[in-house]
């Protein structure tokens, strides 16, 4: 690897570190009406540090949530549902329909694309 290539790679890594900070807001699916078909994505506020999926019969709720409030009593009271199953998770878009872990998030693309471009430039 040439000196020029090393400098380019270091600059790219620095830019990635600047743009990819761990304190950036979490992204979750959010549905105004309880529905299994939800494609609306929202950036959570700083005090909402988890994504919630709650299912009560045919109704499916997806939204930003506080992880410390992720318990049956709080969720059922807030959603006014007596019977439900719920899951709270802390990764971007982890509350999507049938999450199989293969979705690429914007942050993943931000990390991978510049590295692939740098590797391509170094090989040419």
Curated annotation (Swiss-Prot):
Residues 25-101 form the UPAR/Ly6 domain. Residues 1-24 form the signal peptide. Gene3D superfamilies: CD59. Glycans are attached at residue 37. Keywords: Cell membrane, Disulfide bond, Glycoprotein, GPI-anchor, Lipoprotein, Membrane, Secreted, Signal. It is found in: Cell membrane; Secreted. A lipid is attached at residue 101 (GPI-anchor amidated glycine). It is a lipid-anchor; GPI-anchor. Potent inhibitor of the complement membrane attack complex (MAC) action, which protects self-cells from damage during complement activation. Acts by binding to the beta-haipins of C8 (C8A and C8B) components of the assembling MAC, forming an intermolecular beta-sheet that prevents incorporation of the multiple copies of C9 required for complete formation of the osmolytic pore. Interacts with T-cell surface antigen CD2. This is CD59 glycoprotein. It comes from Oryctolagus cuniculus. The gene is CD59.
């Amino acid at each position: 690897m040439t000196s020029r290539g090393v400098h380019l790679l270091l600059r790219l890594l620095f830019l990635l570190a600047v743009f990819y900070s761990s304190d950036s807001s979490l992204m979750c699916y959010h549905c105004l009406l309880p529905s299994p078909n939800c494609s609306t994505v929202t950036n959570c506020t700083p005090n909402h540090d988890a994504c919630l999926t709650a299912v009560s019969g045919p109704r499916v709720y997806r939204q930003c949530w506080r992880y410390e409030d992720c318990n049956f009593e709080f969720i059922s009271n807030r959603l006014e549902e007596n019977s439900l199953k719920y899951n709270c998770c802390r990764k971007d878009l982890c509350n999507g329909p049938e999450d199989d872990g293969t979705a690429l998030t914007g942050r993943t693309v931000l990390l991978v694309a510049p590295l692939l471009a740098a590797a391509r430039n170094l090989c040419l």
